[in-house]
A protein has these predicted regions:
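Phosphate-binding and adjacent anionic-ligand microenvironments
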Residues: 237, 274-454
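General beta-strand structural signal in soluble alpha/beta enzymes
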Residues: 5-6, 47, 73-78, 98-99, ...
Length: 454
């Protein structure tokens, strides 16, 4: 991870950690970098944004930087991250840029970069961009006269994405009552358009963005509102998206939440039964629930475990030609249809399973039972030394042996905070607490523990 760009782009508090000047510099660099590859025409860079007030500021700054370096900036305006990915790869853009901080509060924002096929930008290019931001910007030439780039409204790209989504399901959603929680974010128009076009009776909440209400007590991080709405309106299913709609969680007809693990299980099992799961493998991260692996074993489905982050899930899928992978949080990638997590595609795939099987979501999810989980964040004097400590390693081994096939423990470094994450899954919450506390006690005895964070 670099100074500015992490696993999910350049993110921070708007106007503090991420400023309009940063956005302008990103645009300047991208415009210059891709213009070098075009001798006869202009480089083309497509930009999307979510509904945060600061997204409009960053959109203008990016476009100014891009055009000042001689490239053309195409503006999708408010749209989803997966829409930018789709349009980048299908409309032959040099790269795509999404302005969003995903599920974060409105006062944060971010810049996500994608390569010409809609994948996350490679680390080497982002490192070069960081060096430019911290270096002397004067060495890049300014475009002049007829070389100055154009800024082009590209609403039609968003409409093409909607058309693509509506082409994916093989059956109508007629007679299905579907609730959508759009988190006052990027999906607020697209979600309704897609489900209405597919014949669903669509009920939409949190589709009134005002620039500051994105993710506020709504969407996939506050799904309780959708749970209540599904029960009160007797809906068949509900889907909750985050601010840029690259993740999706579901609510069944009883108002119960299905996280990413349950959604992946349902889809993988259905596709396997239809001979549509290449290599019979699902890609997960190390944070997926122990219950998912138990259910996959029973269903005869193999699985891979990657580091936390949809970037690592996608890399594994691409390298091994796997088709379904994702995270418990609802970042799920269907690689046949997208090169990034797409909340709307996830919702469409789950609808397809419901319609194919003619079963309610509660029945489809019954095959997997989530194990209780306890996770504690622990500040230590040195993360690496603590992980290597013999007493701590012995405690982990003792917990693993005691749980056997009925649970697991996991000790890992946080990628974003100065803490270690201690997690246990077992048959009861009490058993989880016992195992986690045993590992923390070993840290304390070895002199590494500073505090257990609340």
């Amino acid at each position: 991870m670099g100074k500015y760009f992490g696993t999910d782009g350049f993110r921070g508090k708007a106007g503090v950690d991420l400023t309009a000047e940063h956005a302008f510099q990103v645009g300047r660099f991208l415009g210059w970098y891709y213009s070098r590859k075009h001798a006869e025409d202009s480089a083309r860079i497509v930009i999307g944004k979510d509904t945060r007030r600061s997204s409009y500021m960053f959109e203008n700054a990016l476009a100014a930087g891009i055009t000042s370096s001689g490239a053309d900036a195409y503006l999708l305006h408010v749209t989803t991250t997966p829409c930018v990915s789709y349009i980048t790869r299908t409309e032959n853009f040099d790269c795509g840029v999404m302005i969003s901080a995903s599920h974060n509060p409105f006062y944060d924002n971010g810049i996500k970069l994608m390569n010409g096929v809609g994948e996350k930008m490679d680390d080497a290019l982002q490192a070069e961009l960081e060096a430019f931001i911290d270096g002397d910007p004067a060495y890049l030439p300014w475009a002049t006269e007829g070389k100055v780039g154009k800024t082009i409204d590209f609403y039609s790209g968003r409409n093409r994405y909607i058309g693509y989504l509506t082409s994916l399901p093989s059956r109508s959603f007629e007679k299905h009552k579907v609730g959508l929680d759009c988190a006052n974010g990027s999906s607020w128009m697209i979600g309704r358009a897609v489900f209405d076009a597919l014949g669903a009776k669509t009920y939409v909440i949190n589709d009134q963005p005002d620039g500051v209400n994105i993710n506020t007590d709504c969407g996939s991080t506050h799904i309780e509102g959708l749970q209540l709405y599904v029960r009160e309106h007797h809906l068949d299913v509900g889907f909750a998206f985050d601010g840029d709609a690259d993740r999706c969680l579901a609510v069944d007809e009883r108002g119960q939440v299905l996280n990413g693990d349950k959604i992946m299980y349902i889809c993988a099992k259905h596709f396997k039964e239809r001979g549509q799961l290449p290599s019979n493998t699902l890609v997960t991260t190390i944070m997926s629930n122990f219950g998912l692996y138990k259910a996959l074993d029973k269903a005869g489905i193999r699985y891979e475990k990657t580091a936390v982050g949809d970037r690592y899930v996608y890399e594994n899928m691409k390298e091994n030609d796997f088709m379904i992978g994702g995270e418990q949080s609802g970042h799920i990638i269907f690689r046949k249809y997208a090169h990034t997590g797409d909340g709307l595609i996830t919702a469409l795939m789950l609808m397809q399973v419901m319609i194919d099987t003619q079963l309610p979501l509660s029945v489809l999810a019954a095959g997997v039972t989530m194990y209780p989980q306890v996770l504690k964040n622990v500040r230590v004097d040195d993360k690496d030394l603590t992980l290597a400590d013999a007493a701590v390693q012995a405690a982990v081994e003792e917990c693993t042996a005691e749980l056997g096939d009925s649970g697991r423990v996991l000790l890992r470094k946080s990628g974003t905070e100065p803490v270690l994450r201690v997690m246990a899954e077992a048959g009861t919450a009490e058993e989880c607490e016992k195992q986690v506390d045993h590992i923390i006690a070993a840290m304390e005895k070895s002199g590494h523990l500073i505090e257990v964070k609340k």
